[in-house]
Amino acid sequence: MADAAPADVKKLSFERAMEELETIVKRLEDGKVPLEESVAIYERGEALKRRCEELLRQAEARVDKITTDAQGQPVGTEPLDVQ
């Protein structure tokens, strides 16, 4: 898993990237991984984190807030302001 090429991270779904990231975190937290391997899987974890953030930003950009009129009836959508 951790020895997969960095380029393939860009092809992973959010769910798959998150699953792999969680596995890496568990392995690092266990503290039983040799130093060189720890560094390699940490770097992979960083790439996976960036992929998840990218996919979340893309999903966020696609989410719209439904706007309503005075009677509460839906009349359209506008970009969701998540701040």
From Swiss-Prot:
Residue ranges crossing the lipid bilayer per the database entry: none
Coiled coil: none
Keyword Nuclease carried by entry: yes
Keywords linked to the UniProt accession: Cytoplasm, Exonuclease, Hydrolase, Nuclease
Gene3D superfamilies according to UniProt: Exonuclease VII, small subunit
Enzyme class, UniProt record, top EC level: hydrolase
Described purpose of this protein according to its UniProt entry: Bidirectionally degrades single-stranded DNA into large acid-insoluble oligonucleotides, which are then degraded further into small acid-soluble oligonucleotides.
Similarity comment text for this entry: Belongs to the XseB family.
Descriptive protein name: Exodeoxyribonuclease 7 small subunit
Gene: xseB
